[in-house]
């Protein structure tokens, strides 16, 4: 399962202060590859997600899904949920210690779950902070 990256929160206002936190698939945007000021090799495009059924918080004691059809049709996820989680709204995987992402340049990168939160949530997830990211910081 893969979902697009919506940036830190996904539905931030379209003003200059919030634009740096928008991801490629932020809500109500029409971003293109040309919109990515950070460079396509520095920007997350799609990432792995386990979906709601693997999340212990997605069901109540009687097995009823509290979130309904949580991730089906969601389109994009936020980076604000972090990586070290199994919540329905966050990027996650069964791989030991990593989650795989497709960068905007088409490269596939494994991102350590222990990555610095600022690096993941803002610098890799956003498209306009104009900061290069070292692959050493990512893997």
What are these regions (language model features)?
Residues 1-139:
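Surface-exposed loop/linker segments characteristic of extracytoplasmic
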């Amino acid at each position: 399962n893969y979902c697009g990256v919506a940036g830190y929160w996904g539905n931030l206002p379209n003003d200059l202060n919030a634009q740096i936190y928008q991801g490629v698939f932020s809500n109500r945007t029409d971003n293109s590859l040309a919109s990515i000021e950070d460079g396509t090799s520095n920007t997350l495009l799609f990432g792995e997600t386990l979906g709601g059924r693997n999340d212990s918080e997605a069901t109540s004691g009687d097995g009823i899904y509290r979130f309904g059809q949580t991730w089906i049709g969601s389109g994009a996820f936020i980076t604000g949920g972090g990586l070290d989680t199994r919540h329905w709204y966050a990027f996650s995987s069964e791989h030991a210690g990593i989650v795989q992402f497709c960068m905007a340049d088409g490269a596939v990168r494994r991102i350590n779950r222990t990555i610095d939160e600022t690096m993941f949530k803002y610098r890799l997830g956003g498209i306009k902070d104009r900061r290069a990211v070292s692959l050493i910081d990512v893997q």
